[in-house]
Amino acid sequence: MRLSTLTQAVALITATLMLTACGDDSDVSTEIIDGTPPLLTTDSNFSSGYSAVAAVFVSGQVQDSGGIKSVTYTLNGRAPQSLTIDTNGYFNDRILLDLGENSIALAATDNAGNIMRSTKNMYLGDTVAAGGSHTAALHDGQLYGWGRNNYGQTGTAYTSTFTDTMGHPELPTLMNNAPKNLISIKFNQNHSLAIDNKGQVYSWGNDAYGQLGRGQSNRHSCVKSADCRLDISAIAGIDNAVMLAAGYNHNLVLTKDGSIWAFGANAQGQLGNNTAINSSIPVKVDFSASEGVGHIIQVVASSSSSYALDDKGQVWGWGSDASANLGRSQACDKANNCINITNKPVRINVIAQDLADSTAQRVEKEIITQLAAGKDHVLALTNKDSVYGWGLNASSQIGYNGIGFKNTVNAWASTITAPTKLPWFAGQEVRRVYANGNASYVLLDNVAANNSNTRASDGILYAWGMFGETDGKGKTSYENLNEPTNKLTSLKNIDNMTMGTMHLIAHEKPLNQNNGIPFKNGNLFTWGWSFEGSLGNENIAY
């Protein structure tokens, strides 16, 4: 806040005494030149790092006793755009991101022309990926893959197994037949997707349900006849892609204009095109009956359900509701057998006051800013760092249904039928939520250390739901964690992570060099079920 007192240390004051020639009479004039920029504050959503959402919600306040002229943002060096501020200096808006690298500069200008700037760098896309048992990472736009390869899903252009004498990618292997300009990758089960720097989508691996989106012809035979594609090739009909979502046998692609394209299995209506027919080519998700839908900024997919987040903070879902996936306060049982599938998007009311309000009304309002989906459960993160969950909870992936709770009066139900606020995150800085299979994770910043003399840490992962641990003899045991637990105490400073079905890969934020400039690349860490080389370590072969 800019103070108006003359003693303010940063104020530039020029005093000019003008004495008249008339005896002892004199006039004293003091000119105060305002050289102090306004105070600009933003919430934690405006921060550097990887983004799971194709927009950033920018909320904050600008203060200056001399008045505010404007608040603007500049995206990737383009012309400045204005943000609307109310009479108290509050602003709240969303900025759509480009695929890949983004630099956003906020500038608050007061009536004296002083400017306060805040610049953040964000990356829209995933540079690490994990599927059923295959894994990959991008380095300088090139694809490195490893792990299970029975459908050619790593990108080798051939199939292989761990017992082959040569050629199986048990360590990170450069896939020379992949495009050299990739920005984002997404895997699930035994298929793979990628986007290049022009927004073109590529696919390879298992195609038994048409989940590669490349039509019916020219398939290869891997496990069965005509069930895969070994070549990494483009999907026709989709331009300007910015995000991928990989379900178990279907996929979603979000484009720059907010459209969603879907392909693959559709028996539960998970393609959202008002049918229950599989499609091997992209079909557009039908929002024509979705009243009040905003610009879609995120897509996620589960086993047979699909979800979207719009720029109003509204959540939409379609497909299977067998485990209360759509959060409609009812589970599928004999009374409600879910024969009638939901094949078009429906609104999921996550927060009680979740309405399509105006920008001004949203300044103090809690809204959803990020989604994650596991096999049959969903997590939603808000701008207030709250996390909501619903759906399948048999493994305590929502919470309190694991060892010590399950089958007791204190246990949560095995199906959470409506979005429920999870009780563990008050006062925490939740940067990301993750889910796959029957497990959940959050990425926390500013985590206090046990030792009061040690500074707080960023990039700490907490897990709950199904979690496996391996002892010194190589034996792995699984337990269902009731609540978020820091099981990975050696991991810190993580800036992105991807969950496979039962294994994970995380990227460490690059450390600074002596000159303060970050190294270009951080370390990669893998853990979980090691099968066919999925962890990228040749000494692990279970």
Where are these regions (language model features)?
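Eukaryote-biased RCC1-like beta-propeller repeat architecture
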Residues: V10, G23-L39, D43-S44, N121-Y542
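C-terminal motif of bacterial Sec signal peptides marking the signal peptidase cleavage site
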Residues: M18-A21
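Short, solvent-exposed loop/linker segments at the N-terminal edge
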Residues: F46-A54
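Aromatic/hydrophobic beta-strand junction motif of beta-rich domains
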Residues: V58-V62
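Extracellular acidic loop/turn motifs
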Residues: Q63-S70
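Surface-exposed, short loops/turns at beta-strand junctions within beta-sandwich domains
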Residues: R94-E101
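Short, exposed coil/turn segments at beta-strand boundaries within extracellular/luminal domains
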Residues: N111-R117
